[in-house]
Amino acid sequence: MNQNNINKVPLIIYIFSSIILVYIFHNSRSKTGIIIPQISQTGMKIINKKAYYIYFISFLIIGLLASNFYLKELNIKKKSTLTKILQFIGLVACFLNIVQGYYPLDTHKKIHEISAYGGIFLHLLVLSVWLYYNRRKDLITIISLSWLSILLMGPMRTINFNIGSLFQRLCVFFLLLALYMY
């Protein structure tokens, strides 16, 4: 499989696993007003093992394939030190993605949220710096939408939980779309 095809896999995995996890969420809990759960929310005090493994395996694969991108694709010409720093930060972000998958929101909220939002922030930071040196309008738009989604998530969650969760999902979707389009 060539590198361009590998870069497409995380978005496809994210879409399929999200659909499956939302389905499991709605079939495994009492009815509430939550239509769009947070990405990793199973809605149970006792973890649904099927949901847990789908989530963990999907973020394990996403983290590993994204780390492949940082190691093989991320480059800033004539800035080898900056490239190495960004690659390292990107790898840390990928590790945090794997940690977030291992520790579910329902049972390890603090660890999960620190690793999830820390990973998102580091990915956005690395890709924003990379785009500063490698202007690509399509990717600038996508990363800007990801930044906007994560910045609006908090205020939107106070208005309506479903809208906040939608913005959280959009942020990750746009990050993976950028990798897909790379």
Describe the function of each predicted region.
Residues 2-6, 71-84, 132-140, 161-162:
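Membrane-interface helix-boundary motifs at transmembrane edges
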Residues 22, 92-99, 147-157:
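Aromatic-anchored segments of alpha-helical transmembrane domains
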Residues 23, 64-67, 98, 128, ...:
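Hydrophobic residues within the alpha-helical transmembrane core of Major Facilitator Superfamily
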Residues 40, 49-60, 113-123, 165-175:
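Alpha-helical transmembrane segments of polytopic membrane proteins
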Residues 131-182:
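Terminal transmembrane helical module of multi-pass membrane proteins
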